[in-house]
Amino acid sequence: EQLIKKDVKHKDKFAKKSECVRAAAAAFTGGDKS
């Protein structure tokens, strides 16, 4: 969980980019992943 916490802190810098990527991934996978 420590690694995830550190990763989240890093992703927070690219929150907007992550949201776009996650939205694209969700659409690509057909919303299979949350």
Swiss-Prot record:
An example Gene Ontology molecular-function term: toxin activity
Record has Secreted as a keyword: yes
Superkingdom, taxonomy of origin: Eukaryota
Subcellular location(s) of the protein: Secreted
Tissue specificity note: Expressed by the venom gland.
Presence of keyword Transferase: no
Keywords assigned by UniProt, alphabetized: Neurotoxin, Secreted, Toxin
GO cellular component term, pick one: extracellular region
Coarse class of the protein's main subcellular location: secreted
Homology family: Belongs to the scolopendra toxin 3 family.
Name listed for the protein in its UniProt record: Scolopendra 5848.48 Da toxin
Protein's organism: Scolopendra viridicornis nigra (Brazilian giant centipede)
